[in-house]
Swiss-Prot record:
<keyword id="KW-0547">Nucleotide-binding</keyword>
<feature type="repeat" description="MORN 5">
    <location>
        <begin position="133"/>
        <end position="155"/>
    </location>
</feature>
<feature type="repeat" description="MORN 2">
    <location>
        <begin position="64"/>
        <end position="86"/>
    </location>
</feature>
<feature type="repeat" description="MORN 7">
    <location>
        <begin position="182"/>
        <end position="201"/>
    </location>
</feature>
<feature type="domain" description="PIPK">
    <location>
        <begin position="366"/>
        <end position="797"/>
    </location>
</feature>
<feature type="repeat" description="MORN 1">
    <location>
        <begin position="41"/>
        <end position="63"/>
    </location>
</feature>
<feature type="repeat" description="MORN 3">
    <location>
        <begin position="87"/>
        <end position="109"/>
    </location>
</feature>
<dbReference type="GO" id="GO:0009908">
    <property type="term" value="P:flower development"/>
</dbReference>
<dbReference type="Pfam" id="PF01504">
    <property type="entry name" value="PIP5K"/>
</dbReference>
<dbReference type="InterPro" id="IPR003409">
    <property type="entry name" value="MORN"/>
</dbReference>
<dbReference type="GO" id="GO:0046854">
    <property type="term" value="P:phosphatidylinositol phosphate biosynthetic process"/>
</dbReference>
<dbReference type="GO" id="GO:0030154">
    <property type="term" value="P:cell differentiation"/>
</dbReference>
<dbReference type="InterPro" id="IPR027483">
    <property type="entry name" value="PInositol-4-P-4/5-kinase_C_sf"/>
</dbReference>
<feature type="signal peptide">
    <location>
        <begin position="1"/>
        <end position="21"/>
    </location>
</feature>
<dbReference type="Pfam" id="PF02493">
    <property type="entry name" value="MORN"/>
</dbReference>
<dbReference type="InterPro" id="IPR017163">
    <property type="entry name" value="PIno-4-P-5_kinase_pln"/>
</dbReference>
<comment type="function">
    <text>Involved in flowering. May suppress floral initiation by modifying the expression of genes related to floral induction.</text>
</comment>
Length: 801
């Protein structure tokens, strides 16, 4: 049995223990004798090592009093530091590990779980400024799910990542305003719903904490979709919080479980309306700040159905369509009552939380595309891993032929060449692997990055609205690549050839064209694959570069062909994710003269190539990022204040903007590319930089104040001036100062290049020509198509005066 005894020479033992990696080790002295290094240990030993209860004091004044196991602190104990900080709780293997309470020098207190000296698991932190966080921790930071309460009464409850609000969550301010939104790095980012204390509300999109894009504003008394109402029954009749008076309590851990189990379960029903007013704050996680988190919240449920107004009670002018750019209101108009009261309009508003996912949803286990995604990832990982070790060389004619294929069978249990997997058995075919390997190299796409982007630990995202053809689109998690399925609905009628075969037929000339012209705007293809399932079902995929892979928000998207027949979108079908068409375009874009010349020079070359392949139906995909003029940002706070009172910004903010001439209205700056500072380069872009007249015909970078610095290349990060086209010519001439103009950043490229002008298209042209103007329909001769296409774009990008 271990016993108490005195050891007069423990220097060797002390050094051995410390050399084992322990910074808290012990030797024993009895009756106050001191070790040669000045430390003191009094306690129980097992042989020559501390074991059992004991107390160790360091020369700097730190003290541990607790249990030991084979020279390591293990079990319950108390440690006090000279600074005044202390910890009491569980230890394991010499580390703070388990449940315990830490008290900081600044008065902050953490009570909860630990792992390896870091907060990990469930715990509550009361910071020195009286802020509190209650929830889950990971590696010392709030993570996963929790509730943060500021000292002034503001509350956030929802998801966290690495100490910041990240994911779905609800923020409620002390004045009663509530924001139910997605969050990113501590800022509102994504689709959200804001309910003001006045009764007004706004449904729209936030970008890095600012309203951005289209939304709907409801004044007090207007009809609000029923499932958006926050019930007043959360506040009792005497004005106190129902959550504080309820006998039923629910912990943060159970809230987390409920949210995971119930996708439509709303956190905001657990937030009550406070009574006093205070400004909002943003949490900062360090030793000197934090949040006051309630130990529990009310589980009292409610129904908001009885609060919805009848249609007859609604003023048609009490609902407004709005558009914001970086928090600045640039458009407001009464919402069209027909679209608002239509079945599709009501369904769209009532399903705002489904829209919150954006135009895509992450593929999860149980999703209809889950096994297809696993098969695709397994196949790409196998192919890229097989082709990458082969020395890079120029492609040969046989690299395009029918034998240029990689085939493999993937059984669930695995084989000599394939790993076991959790999907279904399938056959894999990869087309022209050496050609696409060279194309990826051409665009500086590293093989490892390519696999991680598509086949990494994260799932792919499926676009919620497939195209007319029935194809389904997937995005890699980093959104660098688009994966499109090629279905039988895209067969060439009569010839019965898949679009895939069209691509493979034109691949040799496509390869030469892309190699010859660095700045080509044509779609970049990086792989073609086929999956065959056991019943014989075949799914073909093509991997392409994503034109809109940018951290900037794309406010408008247009698909421009140059034809007019059927080239408009019904207003009731338009939302912020809609890709608009030719007749919907109400802007022209002025770009720098050298950029315009380079742009149309490349468009002409690309159209010449497509014409040589008898390709039609291609289009220019145009993405627009609007920049808010600096002088308009100064009235943002005014607009936000008006919203909280439910007053229309169109009514109250109709005053003229008188700003100093010294304040620039530019939403961006151009700087020389050789100036110091990192610039973000477009994904899978290899073309040379374009030269700007404004920059003295030198290569330039685009600087967006408050956002970053971007490399300007043809079709990527291109700054321009957008001018709204006025229908009334006289207004345009006489009131040029009132013309709407915006600084914009453009992204563009030519897509849908896999439709030949074949027999079916000739028949389509003949039939439609009987009813419509032959020049207005899309199906025309390739030569006419390319000339009409370029002519239309010249009007979209006119020469500057």
């Amino acid at each position: 049995m271990p016993g108490l005894h005195v050891v007069s020479f423990l220097v060797v033992l002390l050094l051995q223990l410390r050399s084992s990696g322990m910074h808290l080790v012990a030797s024993e002295l009895f009756w106050g004798n001191t070790l040669p290094n000045g430390d003191i240990y009094v306690g129980s030993f097992d042989g020559l090592v501390p074991h059992g209860p004991g107390k160790y004091m360091w020369t700097d004044g730190a003290l541990y009093d607790g249990e030991w196991d084979k020279s390591k602190m293990t079990g319950r104990g108390l440690i006090q530091w000279p600074s005044g900080a202390s910890y009491e709780g569980d230890f394991r293997g010499g580390f703070i590990d388990g449940a315990g309470t830490f008290k900081g020098v600044d008065g902050s207190v953490y009570k909860g779980s630990w792992r390896m000296n870091k907060k990990h698991g469930m715990g509550t932190m009361v910071y020195s400024n009286s802020d509190t966080y209650e929830g889950f921790w990971n590696e010392g930071l709030p993570d996963e799910f929790g509730k943060y309460t500021w000292a002034d009464g503001n509350v956030y409850i929802g998801r966290w990542k690495s100490g910041k609000m990240n994911g779905s969550g609800v923020m409620q301010w002390i004045n009663g305003d509530t924001l139910d939104c997605n969050w990113l790095n501590g800022l509102a980012h994504g689709k959200g719903y804001c309910k003001y204390a006045s009764g007004a509300c706004y449904i729209g999109t936030w970008d890095r904490g600012l309203k951005d894009g289209h939304g709907t504003f409801y004044q007090p008394g207007s009809k609000i979709p029923c499932n958006l109402e926050v019930s007043d029954c959360l506040t009792s009749h005497d004005g106190t919080s129902a959550s504080s008076s309820s006998n039923e309590k629910i912990t943060i851990g159970l809230l987390f479980l409920l949210q995971k189990l119930c996708k439509n379960w709303r956190l905001r029903r657990f937030l009550h309306r406070p009574r006093r007013i205070s400004n909002g704050t943003t949490p900062v996680f360090d030793d000197n700040s934090g949040s006051h988190l309630c130990q529990d919240v009310s589980s009292k449920s409610f129904s908001a159905d009885d609060q919805c107004l009848q249609d007859s009670e609604v003023d048609k002018d009490s609902v407004y369509e709005r558009e914001y750019v970086q928090g600045v209101l640039i458009m407001e108009q009464p919402k069209n009552e027909d679209s608002r009261m239509s079945e599709s309009g009501i369904a769209q508003e009532n399903n705002w939380e489904k829209q919150a996912k954006g135009p895509m949803e992450t593929i999860y286990k149980g999703h209809r595309s889950y096994y297809l995604m696993l098969n695709l990832q397994l196949g790409i990982r196998y192919t890229v891993g097989k082709i990458t070790p082969v020395p890079l060389r120029e492609v040969r004619s046989n690299d395009f032929g029918p034998r240029a294929r990689i085939k493999m069978y993937f059984p669930c249990e695995g084989s000599q060449y394939t790993p076991p997997h959790y999907s279904v058995d399938f056959f894999w075919k990869d087309y022209c692997p050496m050609v696409f390997r060279n194309l990826r190299e051409m665009f500086h796409i590293d093989a490892a990055d390519y696999m991680m982007s598509i086949c990494g630990g994260d799932s792919l995202k499926e676009l919620s609205s497939p195209g007319k053809s029935g194809s389904i689109f997937y995005l890699s998690q980093d959104e660098r690549f688009v994966i499109k399925t090629l279905r039988k609905t895209e067969l060439k009628i009569g010839l019965m050839k898949y679009v895939l075969q069209i691509l493979l037929k034109m691949l040799p000339k496509y390869y030469n064209h892309v190699k010859a012209y660095d700045n080509t705007l044509i779609t970049k293809f990086f792989g073609v694959h086929r999956i065959t399932l056991k019943p014989g079902r075949k799914v073909r995929f093509v991997v392409m570069g994503n034109m809109f892979c940018t951290e900037l928000r794309i406010h408008r998207k247009y698909d421009l062909k140059g034809s007019t027949q059927g080239r408009s979108t019904k207003k009731q079908n338009i939302n912020e994710n809609t890709t608009l068409k030719d007749l919907d375009l109400s802007y022209v874009f002025h770009v720098d003269k050298p950029w315009r010349e380079a742009l149309f020079r490349q468009i002409a070359l690309d159209c010449m190539f497509l014409e040589s392949q008898s390709i039609i139906d291609y289009s220019m995909l145009l993405g627009i990022h609007f920049r808010a003029p600096n002088h308009l940002k100064r009235i943002t706070s005014c607009q936000n204040a008006l919203e909280s009172t439910g007053i229309s910004a169109e009514t109250e903010c109709s005053v003229a903007l008188h700003h100093e001439e010294t304040i620039s209205s530019k939403g961006f700056l151009l700087v020389a590319a050789d100036e110091p500072g990192p610039a973000v380069r477009g994904s899978h872009i290899r073309g040379s930089m374009v030269r700007a007249a404004e920059g003295g015909y030198e290569e330039v970078d685009l600087v967006l104040p408050g956002t970053g610095r971007f490399r300007v290349q043809l079709g990527v990060n291109m700054p321009a001036r957008a001018r709204k086209v006025q229908e009334d010519v006289n207004v345009e001439v006489e009131n040029r100062d009132t013309i709407e103009e915006y600084d914009v950043v453009l992204y563009l490229g030519i897509i849908d290049i896999l439709q030949e002008y074949n027999v079916s298209k000739r028949v389509e042209h003949a039939v439609k020509s009987l009813k419509f103007d032959p020049l207005s329909i899309s199906a025309v001769d390739p030569n006419l198509y390319s000339r009409r296409f370029i002519s239309f774009l010249e009007k979209v990008f006119p020469e500057q005066d």
